[in-house]
């Protein structure tokens, strides 16, 4: 598995080099610096090394972002189901992204907020956290706690700009990354 991630990362770096040659991305001292989950990270293009990121999936997401970045802003909120083939992929996304958080925090919404803040999220309503994935892409997770009448649920929204850059699987992986930091 590690080998296939390494191959994908290698191909992404090749694509990134082409983008840099065309002058579409600015670099300084062979490094790219950007915000990722409110943390400043650096990518050394010469060494093909990430400062501050160890996980292969996260490295691939960052490289996909850099390779497919588009100017402009689109903060219209959408869900996974709004994406092409979103309804088809939703059961898989639900089990990978929604269920782990629902099961962990269904009766503990304050701990949900506490953990979200701890990993760099911003509280935007009673049980909602906004996660700035990149400076122009964010996810919102809203927990609906369990009560006497209804089971717990989770709403996940993200700005449309994310769908303009990422494929549905990348967006699902971003959701999984957030979940892995929350559980």
For every predicted segment, state its role:
Residues 1-33, 58-119:
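Short Lys/Arg-enriched alpha/beta "domain-start" segment
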Residues 3-7, 34, 49-52, 145:
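Extracellular secretory-pathway ectodomains and N-terminal mature segments of eukaryotic proteins
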Residues 27-36, 43, 47-52, 127-132, ...:
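Generic recognition of long tandem-repeat/solenoid scaffolds
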Residues 39-60, 144-169:
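Intrinsically disordered, low-complexity regulatory segments enriched in Ser/Thr/Pro
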Residues 67-81, 90, 132-138, 142, ...:
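Extended, well-ordered protein cores
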Residues 69-74, 149, 181-183:
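Short helix-capping/linker segments at secondary-structure and domain boundaries
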Residues 107-166:
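Conserved binding-pocket/active-site segment within a compact domain
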Residues 162-183:
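Long, compositionally biased interface segments
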């Amino acid at each position: 598995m590690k080998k296939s991630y390494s191959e994908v990362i290698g191909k992404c770096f090749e694509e990134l080099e082409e983008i840099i040659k065309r002058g579409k991305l600015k670099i300084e001292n062979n490094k790219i610096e950007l915000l990722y989950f409110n943390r400043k990270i650096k990518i050394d293009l010469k060494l093909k090394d990430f400062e501050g990121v160890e996980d292969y999936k996260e490295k691939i997401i960052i490289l996909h972002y850099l390779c497919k970045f588009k100017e402009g802003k689109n903060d219209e909120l959408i869900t996974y189901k709004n994406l092409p083939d979103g309804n088809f992929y939703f059961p898989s996304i639900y089990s990978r992204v929604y269920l782990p958080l629902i099961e962990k925090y269904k009766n503990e919404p304050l701990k949900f907020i506490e953990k979200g803040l701890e990993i760099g999220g911003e509280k935007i309503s009673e049980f909602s956290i906004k996660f700035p994935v990149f400076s122009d892409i964010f996810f919102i997770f809203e927990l609906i706690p369990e009560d006497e009448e209804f089971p717990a649920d989770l709403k996940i929204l993200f700005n449309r700009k994310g769908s303009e850059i990422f494929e549905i699987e990348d967006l699902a992986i971003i959701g999984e990354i957030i979940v892995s930091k929350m559980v």
